[in-house]
Amino acid sequence: MGLLTILRQQKLKEREVRVLLLGLDNAGKTTILKCLLNEDVNEVSPTFGFQIRTLEVEGLRFTIWDIGGQKTLRNFWKNYFESTEAIIWVVDSLDDLRLEECRNTLQELLVEEKLLFTSILVLANKSDVSGALSSEEISKILNISKYKSSHWRIFSVSALTGLNIKDAISWLANDLKEIKLGTIDY
């Protein structure tokens, strides 16, 4: 194997990013993934287990692990933390009855040693529906800033209409590029 081949392989590795797509069940994780992949968002069933999809964003290759959010599956999430560089956390902005559970579950993740230096993208999904909480309201409830001073952001999105989905994933890609270049503080 020549030096040029080794350098090319290293450059490809630098572009690869492992992303976990997490959140409570029925938040819209799989629908968001289908939206990102330009697939039909009307044909979605609950994820029991996980699925892995790849997506090119801003010159990075995201390997996205869409993992089911049912309570019985959350104990297995830790098995996927190794080498994770980003988490996309999906919140159902209509489900105010489960926001405390959502906050507690997210905060458990934020203190995991293997996830301390990950970028966190919070997607307040279903924001196109009347009665949805704003991203500001959800941000206040989740209280992420208590655990992370930087490298997180929240977007109000709609997986069904595509509202703000591309902007959100673009923010994540740019944040990860900044981290990979080593020009940031945690």
Swiss-Prot record:
Lipidation sites (N-myristoyl glycine): G2
Q: Name one Pfam family in it.
A: Arf
- Gene3D superfamilies found in the cross-reference section: P-loop containing nucleotide triphosphate hydrolases
Biological process (GO) annotations held by this record are:
protein folding; tubulin complex assembly
In this chain, GTP is annotated as bound at 23-30, 66-70, 125-128
User: What stretches pass through the bilayer?
Assistant: none
| Keyword terms, alphabetized | Cytoplasm, Cytoskeleton, GTP-binding, Lipoprotein, Microtubule, Myristate, Nucleotide-binding
Which Gene Ontology MF annotations are present?
Answer: GTP binding; GTPase activity
Q: Where in the cell is it found?
A: Cytoplasm, Cytoskeleton
Q: Which domain of life is it from?
A: Eukaryota
What PROSITE patterns is this protein classified in? ARF
Give the main localization category: cytoplasm
Q: State the function annotated in the UniProt record.
A: Has a role in the cofactor-dependent pathway of microtubule biogenesis. Required for growth polarity control.
Q: Which NCBIfam families match?
A: small_GTP
Protein family = Belongs to the small GTPase superfamily. Arf family.
- Protein name as it appears in the record: ADP-ribosylation factor-like protein alp41
Organism source for this protein?
A: Schizosaccharomyces pombe (strain 972 / ATCC 24843) (Fission yeast)
